[in-house]
From Swiss-Prot:
Biased composition regions of type Low complexity, renumbered to the chain: 26-48, 97-107
Renumbered residue ranges of the record's region Disordered: 26-130
Protein name: Acid shock protein
Propeptide: 22-86
Subcellular location: Periplasm
Gene: asr
GO cellular component, one term: periplasmic space
Biased composition (Basic residues): 87-96, 108-117
Post-translational modification: Proteolytic processing gives rise to the active protein.
Cleaved signal peptide residues: 1-21
Organism: Cronobacter sakazakii (strain ATCC BAA-894) (Enterobacter sakazakii)
Pfam families per the UniProt record, alphabetical: Asr (PF06392)
């Protein structure tokens, strides 16, 4: 039984057919018949692959296509001066968006003031109900 198991393991590991046949002759006849049925599937050669021929373009067309790609890439790039101006615009917007510290402090004060007003308004409404 151990030899049968060893043969199955050997077949799955892909040992050569000659070594596999030598092991089969040493095994008893019933065991050999059992191993040939179990290992026949892994020993099969893979199905023949059909090779599809790739259609090759002419070298001139390929070169022209590559030139087109590089040309597009160059056209998309902005000049360095414009890029710098764009960065300056961004920084300018950021500076304009910031509020002065005084206004921010006033906003915080407004929030606290509103909260206090809401609290005071809620108390008188509760008193007449009681």
């Amino acid at each position: 039984m151990k030899k049968v198991l060893a043969l199955v393991v050997a077949a799955t590991m892909g040992l050569s057919a000659a070594a596999f046949a030598a092991d089969n002759t040493a095994a008893p006849a019933p065991a050999a018949a059992a191993t040939t049925t179990t290992t026949a599937a892994p020993a099969k050669a893979p199905a023949a692959k059909t090779h599809h021929k790739k259609s090759h373009k002419k070298a001139v067309e390929q070169k022209a296509q590559a030139a087109k790609k590089h040309h597009k890439k160059a056209a998309e790039q902005k000049p360095a001066a414009e890029q710098k101006a764009q960065a300056a615009k961004k920084h300018h917007k950021k500076a304009a968006a910031q509020k002065p510290a005084v206004e921010q402090k006033a906003q915080a004060a407004k929030k606290h003031h509103k909260k206090a007003v809401k609290h005071d308004a809620a108390k008188p409404a509760a008193q007449p109900a009681a």
